[in-house]
Amino acid sequence: MKILIIGATGRTGRLVVEEALKQGYDINVLVRDRNKIPFNSKSVQVYQGTPTRQTDLAAAMRGCEAIICALGIVRASDAPWSKLITPPNFISESMKNVIAEAGQQNLKRLITVSAWGVGETKKEIPFWLRWLINYTNLRPVYAEHELEEKLLSASSLRWTALRPVALNDAKKKKTLKISFNNFPKPSLQISRQSVAKFMVDIVKSDKYDMKSPTISES
């Protein structure tokens, strides 16, 4: 089975590629800069371009049966007030093209990374996180994830929008916690490694179709 991974050079996207290779998938990746590709495998086909151009997506999507999207709004640093590097509408414009091209190619399965605090989970998050979302440069990031999920909900795709809590780079394996309606109550952190593994694990599953689980670690 071949999958398209978008956002493959990011901190989570790189781990998605590694996990997909471990699980035996053939992979197409769409990247803006080939020089940022950290992997070398015969199972990875590289396409240069951007998801904000549907023609670039068309070539990269051909022959794939599923899409994993690990796009984000990049900031100058992890500080919530730091300057946005990518355009503030990057995720939603990309997702519009992904949905349109998937329809053209009759591709149905898509898994993407959203965020805890989007949609109905906004009432679940701590006050301090809600304040940061409202008054820092996290605001446009969350606005994009809100729009991304609305676009997916209106589509005919078999989508899953994961809502991870705060991401870290820990390598130690912990128990994954999957929550709906704040049950079980999420913890505050999850490793990018765990997010990447879960994204690949559910490619062939329909258990989370049209759902947005919150994921954390216990």
Describe the predicted segments one by one.
Residues 6, 30, 70-71, 110-116, ...:
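SDR active-site strand-loop-helix element
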Residues 91, 144, 162, 190-200, ...:
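Substrate-positioning beta->alpha
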Residues 3-25:
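N-terminal Rossmann NAD(P)H-binding glycine-rich loop of SDR-like oxidoreductase domains
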Residues 35-97, 101-104, 203:
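NAD(P)H-binding glycine-rich loop region in Rossmannoid oxidoreductase-like domains
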Residues 122, 155, 171-176, 202-211:
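Glycine/proline-rich active-site loop of Rossmann-fold NAD(P)-dependent oxidoreductases
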Residues 26-28, 34, 82, 88, ...:
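Conserved Rossmann-fold NAD(P)-dependent oxidoreductase catalytic core, especially the SDR/UDP-sugar
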Residues 4, 28, 47, 160:
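Conserved beta-strand positions in the Rossmann-like core of class I SAM-dependent methyltransferases
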Residues 149-170:
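Conserved beta-loop-beta element that borders a ligand/cofactor-binding pocket
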